[in-house]
């Protein structure tokens, strides 16, 4: 695990301990039961069935490697723009310390449109999954580089028991083998190495031979142009998680349409 990932995971464990003291499980369960669910996997499949790219459009203010991506940051406006320009789903950063995200951003983005929403954070404990359900998320991210296989399987089972979809993220073939032990159809291949932050879309292409036909590859990071999109679609990769390219554009939704449609 990289130094930055080590630091993030350590902070997450501290955050979970603090959150459990301030918001007990029973209170969260009540909040979660009051939330409706949107079909995250179904939204992606519907786009693909129509012959379109299935885009998970990210609402992200900043990152540790790139700093602030967008100064004028209004999650509700961004979400509406994505929805109007063909996104299948949203991804919203809720990590505060490293990505300047917020639970409030997820709530605002989801309230502004009808798209299913992924809670983008570093999940290390089942408590965060219940939190995700309570804040209105429809899906969670599990990062193979941060979790051992038994824990990842347990977290997936708990997420599914709450009705949440799971996107499992990998960067290399060993992590892909780990991910393939899960039941989720959504296999995210992160083109960014979390150890070095180097990015190459070849990472996705090099792992396609491992993917069973019933699974859906979601290529993540480094998709910055129409050329990158065309390269992926030519290899039959039709689901994308994109943040930086949209966040740096004057009009995020228009940039989505320009790159994908």
UniProtKB/Swiss-Prot annotation:
Catalysis performed (reactions): 1-(2-carboxyphenylamino)-1-deoxy-D-ribulose 5-phosphate + H(+) = (1S,2R)-1-C-(indol-3-yl)glycerol 3-phosphate + CO2 + H2O
Class of enzymatic activity (EC top level): lyase
Keyword Amino-acid biosynthesis: yes
GO MF annotation, one: indole-3-glycerol-phosphate synthase activity
Lineage: superkingdom: Bacteria
EC number: 4.1.1.48
Pfam family, one: IGPS
Gene Ontology BP annotations: L-tryptophan biosynthetic process
Statement: the UniProt record of this protein carries the keyword Amino-acid biosynthesis: yes
Keywords from the UniProt entry: Amino-acid biosynthesis, Aromatic amino acid biosynthesis, Decarboxylase, Lyase, Tryptophan biosynthesis
This protein's pathway: Amino-acid biosynthesis; L-tryptophan biosynthesis; L-tryptophan from chorismate: step 4/5
Family, similarity comment: Belongs to the TrpC family.
Listed PANTHER family: INDOLE-3-GLYCEROL-PHOSPHATE SYNTHASE, TRYPTOPHAN BIOSYNTHESIS PROTEIN
NCBIfam families (alphabetical): PRK00278.1-6, PRK00278.2-4
Protein name: Indole-3-glycerol phosphate synthase
Name of the encoding gene: trpC
């Amino acid at each position: 695990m990289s130094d930055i990932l080590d630091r993030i995971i350590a902070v997450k464990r501290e955050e979970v301990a603090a959150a459990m003291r301030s918001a007990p499980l029973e209170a969260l369960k009540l909040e979660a039961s009051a939330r409706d669910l949107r079909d995250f996997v179904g939204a992606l499949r519907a786009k693909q069935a129509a012959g379109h790219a299935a885009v998970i459009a990210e609402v992200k203010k900043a990152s540790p490697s790139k700093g602030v991506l967008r100064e004028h940051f209004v999650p509700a406006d961004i979400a509406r723009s994505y929805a109007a320009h063909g996104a299948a789903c949203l991804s919203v950063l809720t990590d505060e310390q490293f990505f300047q995200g917020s639970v409030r951003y997820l709530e605002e983005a989801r309230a502004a449109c009808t798209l299913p929403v992924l809670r983008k954070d570093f999940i290390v404990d089942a408590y965060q999954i219940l939190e995700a359900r309570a804040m209105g998320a429809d899906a969670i991210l599990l990062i193979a580089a941060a979790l051992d296989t038994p824990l990842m399987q347990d977290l997936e089972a708990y997420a599914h028991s709450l009705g949440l979809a799971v996107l499992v993220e990998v960067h290399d073939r060993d992590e892909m083998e780990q991910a393939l032990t899960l039941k989720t159809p959504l296999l995210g291949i992160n083109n960014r190495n979390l150890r070095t932050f180097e990015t190459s879309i070849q990472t996705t292409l090099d792992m396609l031979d491992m993917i069973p036909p019933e699974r859906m590859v979601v290529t993540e990071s480094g998709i910055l142009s129409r050329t990158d999109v065309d390269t992926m679609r030519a290899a039959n990769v039709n689901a994308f998680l994109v943040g930086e390219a949209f966040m740096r554009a004057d009009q995020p939704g228009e940039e989505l349409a320009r790159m994908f449609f």
